[in-house]
Amino acid sequence: MLNVFSKIFGTRNDKEVKKYRKKADAITALESKYTDLSDDELKNEFQKLKELVQKGEKTLDNVLFQSFAITREASRRVLNMRPYDVQLIGGMVLHEGRIAEMKTGEGKTLVGSLAVSLNALEGKGVHVVTVNDYLASRDANELRPLYEFLGFSVGAVVGGLKDDEQRREQYACDITYGTNNEFGFDYLRDNMCFDIKDKVQRGHNYVIVDEVDSILIDEARTPLIISGPTNHKNSNYLKANEIALKLEKGELIEPKSAAEKPITTGDFIVDEKNRAVTLTEQGHEAVEKLFGVDNLYSIENAMLSHSLDQALKANYIFKKDVDYVVKDNQIIIVDEFTGRLSEGRRFSEGLHQALEAKEGVTIQDESQTLADITFQNYFRMYKKLAGMTGTAQTEATEFAQIYNLDVVSIPTNIPVKRIDKNDLIYKSEKEKFEAVCNKIKELHEKGQPVLVGTASIEKSEKLHKILVDKKIPHTVLNAKQHEKEGKIIADAGQKGAVTIATNMAGRGVDIKLTKEILDLGGLAIIGTERHESRRIDNQLRGRSGRQGDVGESQFYLSLEDNLLRIFGSDRIKGIMERLGIEEGEHIESRMVTRAVENAQKKVESMHFESRKHLLEYDDVANQQRKVIYSFRNDLLKPDYDITSKIDENRIEYVQNLLTEANITSGMAEDDFNYEFIVNRFLEDLHFKINVEDIKKESYEELEEHLISILKDVYDKKMSVTSLEQKSEIERILYLQILDSAWREHLYAMDTLKTGIGLRGYNQKDPLVEYKKESYNMFIELIGNIKNEIIKILFTIQLQSQEDKQKEQEALAKMKEQMEKSTEHITTNIAQEAVKNSDKKIARNEPCPCGSGLKYKQCCGKSGPKIGLAAGK
């Protein structure tokens, strides 16, 4: 019914495009005004727009038509490319903070330049995010002549830029290209520096995310993490792996009626749909016996049970050459969406160590999170977020709910001529691959190039062996040959070429066809399996039929494919049985294709809920992160009044001390617990005071007197240094105490999140419990930070120095030591849960902070001392 109304009245998208077409016509009408101008005159016209916007006399919307018309004319002159009307529409969609869905080959790079040029007029910086360094550099260099013609500076932040000064220069440009990882990690590093001058980013104004579905959907479950060594060790992985292999896999037998309970067999049940493994009652008993413990789920055995959970996942859910490969004595993750090897990335929560134990490679140490953020929360920091991709409509709901982004499908400049055929479904994988090979042979002999998409390295190598046996020449592109990707994809359109590729096939790389190939039917796409996401299938199809080229696509499936086996084969199997399909035969119908798409929708919905669930938890941490980072940024500002902050903390310290001593307003003086105060002063602040010296008649007098005593003692201690040096010492100490406490808090939050799901068994909502407990932990964290700064400031020992130059040098050395430490932590960082192998400091080694004390007596004991020895 909805389709009928859409055909009569037009879809919402059609109406949106119609409005944009009118605006595009208005831009085109301005074209003649600028075509006759000289280059200098055209540049001056654009500079006038910039001045109007920056003075606040005009908004970006006010100057959109002129900006687009000038940029279009400049593009024609400088790049020899004139944006089509549909590209103008795409540019307007991006400017409005929406997602422009544009088919492959429709010139997204040029579309982006229109919105970038307009928004760069404000002078607040525009970021353009791509999926890899190659595309960031390529796009920046291709468009640099255009942007420079318009008076903008252009930068690119890529992995090779190690020097902070170079990175700062790139961010200072009007327009900065880079990858999502580089932008995200620079943000985290900026919030770990000790001087505001060391920050490289200058704010988050406007961002365009290219391949937005890949970054904001596929990578949404991948947090960016900077990590360092941890004191929390878990040495149970080998034992857990050994036990996991001894257990017997069982199955869940569904009850025949509602009155009956499900029956389980064996020691554990594998749930492929949710990628989970659950122990049965029989399994619990077996594991407790093998581990030699009475209760696997008691608090003292938490590490054991966690290790076993990960060992079961590693052995029965994660597959070699599908989810990961073993290379150079390491487990390397295979990106499930691109098929690429993710060098340096590690699974979190001990799963990577469990895989290392499974494959018999070196088990690397676990590490502790120092700073983290998800892409979801990083990109939501921008004042305006927009995106481009060839495939977004299937995820439109998620873009709207999570990022508040609308998706607008931009019409192609030339209608798509590719023919997308119905799926062919076979009973077995063997029959399917036989049919695929026969089709490949037919196309190859005809001379028509064919690109064959596979779901994993394992499947691509299986198909490769069959083609070798049949003597059909071909090229394989999977994560193991990713170095040759550019050339393999470029050659995929040659006459008679047969290219087998995992999902990595060429985002951002064009397969250009000659007239001879187009006459043969263009590029043929064969999918050997449906991906869990329709979007990935659409990307494969989109490799053919670019810019109005002819082409064809078809998927070959079997009932043994994971998607059909786990999510949707019963109905399809029933159809095949009713039709009496024999071995080697297939069915092809729109009804079956719809059934497959429904199975995909189920999986997409499940993944959406998973990402939404992750965001709900991360939002809790994100609110806390904002508070900590905001205060940290204040501390870095030269004009921040750190002395007043210390005064506040000192007052709070006294108030908390009186509360702990059970001394309240209105209480009789005889009941005041003076001994408690005297003992705490000695324990916390390392100075002695007599009871007689602090006796007062009321709570208010006592509070005021104690605050005054602490101020006098502190001022006397700090009198040996200048006011400037005093502020610098207070600031650096505060930063390190804040960072140290935040790191421990992140570890505690990770631990809380790991076990919070068990609250569900007690009829409690785990998310509500997590919010409640993490809030209490955060309040405690803030209190501890304030307390700790007072303790450290009172216990540091400052030497009286006549030579102020030496004092300056000592302080500079302290800063240098801390910054080196931070840089060391961020070496070789990558996506996902980054687990560095930083050397752990032995307890008896000199402390790296420069105090001259042993580590166990300094930072290893009660937090960092910033090169200032603790003393009474």
UniProtKB/Swiss-Prot annotation:
Question: What is the E.C. number?
Answer: 7.4.2.8
GO annotation terms (biological process)? intracellular protein transmembrane transport; protein import; protein targeting; protein transport by the Sec complex
Cellular compartments annotated? Cell inner membrane; Cytoplasm
| Cofactors (names) | Zn(2+)
User: So where does ATP get bound?
Assistant: 87, 105-109, 510
Record field: catalytic activity:
ATP + H2O + cellular proteinSide 1 = ADP + phosphate + cellular proteinSide 2
GO MF annotations, alphabetized:
ATP binding; metal ion binding; protein-exporting ATPase activity
What family is this protein classified in?
Belongs to the SecA family.
What is this protein's record name?
Protein translocase subunit SecA
Q: Which organism is this entry from?
A: Aliarcobacter butzleri (strain RM4018)
